[in-house]
């Protein structure tokens, strides 16, 4: 990623499993273009740690997670979870962070901490003139 855009992002991930130098990041691996599953490591995809050796994750969230891990001097492990299990995975300590296109709602902020937004989207409805 272009560091010009990410240089002012504060990376604060407390209580990561720094003892082994690994940043464990959860995502759905099913929400393209942010994250998806593929069968090869093409185009910079990374193995999905909890899916055996045959599946890989890729997408914007993977690229950003790779950047964060590299910035912290850590290796990256990506874990695939169902959407409803992502926050629980962080709370239980199974993973250190979530990178999954998750909006910071007040309800979620009661359960986990959020960084600054790294992507903003304006959704619209398109209709015939």
Language-model regions: role of each:
Residues 66, 108, 128-129:
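Arginine residue identity/basic-tract feature
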Residues 1-102:
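Extracytoplasmic small-molecule ligand-binding "clamshell" domains
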Residues 94, 106-121:
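Ligand-binding "clamshell"
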Residues 24-32, 114-129:
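Hydrophobic/proline-rich hinge and linker segments of small-molecule sensing/allosteric domains
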């Amino acid at each position: 990623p272009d560091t010009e855009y990410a240089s002012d992002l504060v990376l604060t991930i407390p209580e990561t499993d720094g003892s082994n130098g690994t940043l464990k990041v959860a995502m759905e691996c099913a929400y393209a273009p942010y994250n998806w599953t593929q069968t090869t490591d093409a185009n910079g995809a990374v193995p999905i740690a909890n899916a055996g050796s045959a599946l890989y994750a890729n997408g914007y969230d993977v690229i950003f997670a790779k950047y964060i891990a590299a910035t912290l001097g850590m290796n990256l492990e990506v874990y695939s979870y169902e959407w409803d299990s992502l926050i629980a995975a962080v709370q239980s300590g199974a993973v250190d962070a979530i990178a999954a296109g998750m909006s910071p709602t007040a309800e979620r902020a009661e359960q986990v901490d959020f960084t600054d937004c790294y992507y903003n989207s304006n959704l619209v409805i398109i209709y015939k003139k």
